[in-house]
Design a protein with these regions (language model features):
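Intrinsically disordered, low-complexity regulatory regions of eukaryotic regulatory proteins
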Residues: 6, 19, 43, 89-90
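Short, flexible coil/linker elements and helix-boundary hinge sites characteristic
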Residues: 39-40, 78, 84, 88
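Short, charge/polar-rich alpha-helical segments
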Residues: 1-26
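Amphipathic alpha-helical coiled-coil segments
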Residues: 21-22, 48-80
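Short acidic DE-rich linear segments
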Residues: 1-3, 83-92
């Protein structure tokens, strides 16, 4: 039981960490788009920024997936915790 609660706390921390990473990525995307708005960019620099933007978009999508999976694990963990509580209370 205590292990399940400790596991849930670790998941909460992982979600917070990934959300912080995602916030940084969103900021980098905004900065990259601002740079791309400059019409006087050299074509090589523009291509490089477009590649960076594509990578940032993919990184953000991966963080969203990770957050979603961690939340699924938390829901499952809660269900198991509730099940164990009910199971142990019936034994007593």
């Amino acid at each position: 039981m205590e292990q399940l609660l400790a596991y849930e706390e670790r998941l909460r921390q992982k979600i917070a960490d990934v959300e912080a990473e995602k916030a940084q990525i969103v900021l980098q995307k905004r900065e990259t788009r601002d740079k791309l708005a400059n019409e006087s960019l050299h074509p090589v620099e523009r291509a490089s920024l477009n590649e960076l933007l594509a990578a940032l978009i993919k990184a953000e999508e991966l963080r969203d997936t990770l957050i979603s999976r961690y939340r699924e694990f938390m829901r499952y963990n809660r269900l198991m915790t509730e099940h164990n509580i009910r199971h142990h209370s019936h034994e007593e």
